[in-house]
Amino acid sequence: MHELSLCEGILQILEEQSRTQGFIQVHRVCLEIGALASVEPEALRFHFDVVTQGTLAEGSHLEIVTVPAQAWCLPCGEKVSVGQYFDACPQCGSRQLQVIAGEELRIQQLEVE
């Protein structure tokens, strides 16, 4: 249930940006979440609504964009899609993969006033 602490961190970022950028209300938050980030989107949405009550982000829409997991295969040099850590390369069968996408958790865009 680390989604609660993630939402608290997101709110902290929103409050800091509000002070530096001068906005007073958040209408929409768009997050990029990698497929390997171990984040449950529905739990994140639930906790976001709870954490933002009474704040500048209360009632804002949380949009989640899932980033597919991709890796680079060291032996064959191919960029491949993976479903989880330690998957084998679909091209050569090697497990020597370096993840290059899918671990993200970042605020991609805000709609504010």
Curated annotation (Swiss-Prot):
Gene3D superfamilies: 3.30.2320.80
Amino-acid positions noted as binding Zn(2+) in the UniProt annotation, renumbered to this chain: 73, 76, 89, 92
InterPro entries in the record: HypA/HybF (IPR000688)
Keywords linked to the UniProt accession: Metal-binding, Nickel, Zinc
A GO biological process held by the record: protein maturation
UniProt-annotated binding residues for Ni(2+): 2
Molecular function, one GO term: zinc ion binding
Domain of life of the organism encoding this protein: Bacteria
Pfam families per UniProt: HypA
Family, similarity comment: Belongs to the HypA/HybF family.
Function: Involved in the maturation of [NiFe] hydrogenases. Required for nickel insertion into the metal center of the hydrogenase.
Protein name, UniProt field: Hydrogenase maturation factor HypA
Lineage: Bacteria, Pseudomonadati, Pseudomonadota, Acidithiobacillia, Acidithiobacillales
